[in-house]
C-alpha cells in the first residue's frame, strides 16, 4: 500500500512521519500571554514550514528526473510501455503527456492496481500484463526504487508491488529507473534498512526462520498501515516480509577481496538475492540486479532486472544520470 504521497511507510520508519502531527501538550489550558505558548507555536510553525519546503523540493526533484528520463528515452513510436509503482512515476506519466505526441496507439502496462489507476486517470490506455499478446516485448519500462547503489542494483517493494515490477522490467527492452537523490547510496541497505520479499502466506513462518538463518535481523511480516495486526496483502494476495540485513557488498567489493558469501551475515547483492529466492514459499525478492535489457538480449533473452540508466532529481533542480556498464 502507498501513502497519499505515493510512498509506503513500514512500521519500522513510521515514527519519522509523526513529528509534525504532535500537538503541544496542554496548549488549550494555557493563557495566550504565556511565553511558553508563543515559543511552542513558533517552533511548531517553523518545523511545519521547513518540512513543507523540503517536501516541495523533493517533489520538484522527482518531477525534473521524470521529465529528463522521458525526454531522453521515450520511444516516440512506442507500442507497449511499462509504468511502475514508485512515487516518482506520477511525474513520468505527466512527462509522457507533456510530450504532445499521439499516444492513442500505445498501451501502458501497469505494475499494480494503483499504477493502473494512474495510467487511466491520465487518459492513457492500460493493459494488464497477463493480457499482453504472446511474445509481446515492451519497448521500455519506467519505475522508481527505494534505494540504488553505485552499480545500479536496486531495492524495490516499498509499495508492495515488487513481483509485478520485476516481471514488467524483465519483459522490456530497456528499464529506466527514476528517483530523487535520497535514493542513491554507495551500497544497498545503507539508508533503506530492509529487503521486501513477497511470500505465500502459508509459508510465512518458515520463510522468517530461514531469513534469520541467512543473517537477517528481526524479519517481519508487513502489516497494513491502518490495521497493525492484519498482514498487508499484495495484488497476488501474498504477504510481504521485510528483512533487514547488513549493507550489501557490490561486485566491485568482492573483486578487491571482500567476502560476500554470507559469512557473519555479510552478503553481496546477487548472492543474497539468489539465497532468498531459493527459500520455499518465496515468490520473489525486492532486489533488482544482474543483467540490463541489452545485456540479456545479447545472450538471447528479452529484458533485465537492472536499469540501463537511473535518473536522480537533485535538491538544486538538476538531474544526475547514472548509466549501467555496457
Model-derived segments and their meaning:
Residues 2, 8:
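Cationic, low-complexity basic patches in intrinsically disordered or flexible, solvent-exposed regions
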Residues 14, 38, 47-141, 146-153:
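N-terminal glycine-/serine-/threonine-rich phosphate-binding loop
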Residues 33:
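Short polybasic linear motifs
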Residues 27, 75-78, 99-102, 291-303:
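Alpha-helix termini
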Residues 55-64, 117-326:
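Conserved phosphate- and dinucleotide-binding cores of soluble alpha/beta proteins
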